[in-house]
């Protein structure tokens, strides 16, 4: 049984009218703004004076302008943002990518190799996850075929060391929620950005979508459980500071019977 976590994991507090939340000097959260479909969080990485900033994920359709505006309001020059690094390419994470690219000409797209090929080929099965959801979203948002075809500038692989913004982040391939899911890990500070593989409150990502795999998700959770994590920055919902030892392991153990 899950234990109540309020006050235990010390969630980073946020106001509903505040989109940008400072995690540290070189790391900010741009909060998702959920609608009928969830809008993923976006993270801004890099030392402010480096001129080499990165966004982790983009978010839902129609949210790009507001996210760029929130960056400007915080004093960030969009031209200093050099790349978008995707934790995975589901719709709620990649939906407004083209909007962001329109605001920041020349920005690069970095995606794990398992999802880069389909993205470049216009194979949107991973983006939508299931056919029924695709039909609903195309009708709701007037999305055309090929709307999520992109050129990928860098194909990420497990173990890559990303030296960006005056810092270093390790790429961990954590499939299961999606084929090309990745986490970014700052080992020195114990900061983990796991996309939708694990959340607060002992929750994990779905494993019933296209290219999802429950056994792979189980292995990915087990792998993450072996990391030293002090701050957990998921793709949705609460972000967590002062994560107790064993939190990810307990989450993995709780879900293991459903993932085997």
Regions found by a protein language model. Give the residues of each.
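Residue-level marker for buried hydrophobic side chains located in beta-strands
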Residues: 54-56, 85, 109, 191-193, ...
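Metallo-beta-lactamase
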Residues: 60-62, 161, 168-255, 259
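Conserved beta-strand hairpin/beta-sheet module of binuclear metal-dependent hydrolase folds
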Residues: 20-74, 183-195
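Active-site HxH/HxHxD metal-binding segment of metal-dependent hydrolases
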Residues: 60-65, 72-160, 251-257
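Short catalytic-loop micro-motif centered on adjacent basic/acidic residues
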Residues: 29, 54-57, 83-85, 171-173
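N-terminal amphipathic/basic-hydrophobic helices that include classical n-h-c signal peptides
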Residues: 1-18
């Amino acid at each position: 049984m899950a234990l109540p976590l309020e006050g235990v994991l010390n969630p980073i507090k946020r106001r509903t009218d505040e989109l940008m939340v400072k995690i540290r000097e070189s790391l900010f959260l741009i909060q998702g703004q959920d609608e009928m479909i969830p809008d993923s969080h976006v993270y801004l990485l890099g030392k402010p004076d480096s001129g080499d900033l990165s966004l982790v994920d983009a978010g839902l359709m129609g949210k790009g302008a507001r996210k760029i505006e929130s960056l400007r309001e915080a004093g960030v020059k969009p031209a200093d943002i050099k790349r978008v690094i995707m934790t995975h390419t589901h719709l709620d994470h990649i939906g407004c990518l083209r909007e962001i690219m329109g605001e920041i000409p020349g920005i690069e797209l970095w995606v794990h190799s398992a999802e880069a090929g389909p993205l470049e080929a216009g194979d949107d099965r991973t983006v939508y996850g299931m056919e029924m959801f695709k039909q609903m979203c195309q009708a709701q948002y007037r999305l055309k075929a090929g709307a999520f075809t992109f050129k990928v500038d860098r194909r990420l692989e497990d173990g890559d060391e990303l030296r960006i913004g005056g810092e270093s982040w390790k790429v961990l391939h954590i499939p299961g929620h999606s084929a090309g899911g990745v986490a970014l890990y700052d080992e020195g500070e114990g900061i983990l950005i796991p996309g939708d593989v694990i959340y607060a409150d002992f929750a994990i990502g779905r494993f019933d979508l296209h290219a999802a795999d429950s056994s792979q998700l189980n292995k990915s959770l087990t792998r993450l459980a072996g990391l030293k994590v002090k701050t957990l920055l998921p793709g949705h919902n609460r972000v967590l500071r002062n994560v107790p030892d064993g939190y990810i392991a307990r989450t993995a153990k709780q879900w293991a019977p459903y993932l085997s």
